UniProtKB/Swiss-Prot annotation:
Its biological purpose: Part of the ABC transporter complex PstSACB involved in phosphate import. Responsible for energy coupling to the transport system.
Keyword Zinc attributed: no
E.C. number(s) listed in UniProt: 7.3.2.1
Gene Ontology CC: plasma membrane
Assembly information from the UniProt record: The complex is composed of two ATP-binding proteins (PstB), two transmembrane proteins (PstC and PstA) and a solute-binding protein (PstS).
Name of protein: Phosphate import ATP-binding protein PstB 1
UniProt entry keywords in alphabetical sequence: ATP-binding, Cell membrane, Membrane, Nucleotide-binding, Phosphate transport, Translocase, Transport
Organism: Bacillus licheniformis (strain ATCC 14580 / DSM 13 / JCM 2505 / CCUG 7422 / NBRC 12200 / NCIMB 9375 / NCTC 10341 / NRRL NRS-1264 / Gibson 46)
Keyword set includes Translocase: yes
Amino acid sequence: MSAVTAVKPEDVYQINDLNLWYGEHHALKNINLTIPEYEITAIIGPSGCGKSTFIKTLNLMINMVPNVKMTGEISYNGTNVLNSKVDLVELRKKVGMVFQKGNPFPQSIFDNVAYGPRIHGLKNKKELNERVEKALVDVALWDEVKDRLHSQALGLSGGQQQRLCIARALATNPDVLLMDEPTSALDPVSTLKIEELMLKLKEKYTIAIVTHNMQQASRISDQTAFFLMGELIECNDTVKMFSSPDDHRTKDYITGRFG
């Protein structure tokens, strides 16, 4: 009987020879990387290595920074998003972003989650209610807030606010979720809830997460990319990366010799 061949996941992103400058500063240098569908890709590296810059290129949030120039290719589902004809609103609808600290709008819990669908034209009240409920269920927040949906979101705890922001990103029905250090401002219990949530969400979404926490990267990710001084040093299966990395600089970083 022949051996069963593992099915390789499709690559949602293919990044080829990506370079980025802030003015004269060369921040990303010849980045080549793929991000597989329905997996968690962890992006690690010391402060200033380019990891947050990189993740913001994936839905072109980086374009909000003045004097940014990019060359190369960022292919999302076969389309180079660096093409000037790309619809940025549609791209950011399909590639959501969650930042380091929960940043709910000064509105109700309901209005925070409904914000994205509304700006994308969803007006039917029943559909909007269903979309909000589904997003809150997906982030395991529904049972905690269903009786106070019209209360101020800023009254939630830090961990709840971060889950609310994830729900807000999910409400537009994205394919990809980008997370820039989403647990760095949270306590250990809230961090664990977010990690458990990410492992559940990868059944439906492709996730890329920037993290300074090596234990977190090893716990939740399928592949890990190590950045250093604007270069991608190594991208590998997470188990291999943390047990026998190919590059000595990767080993030095994950074992705490610098960073």
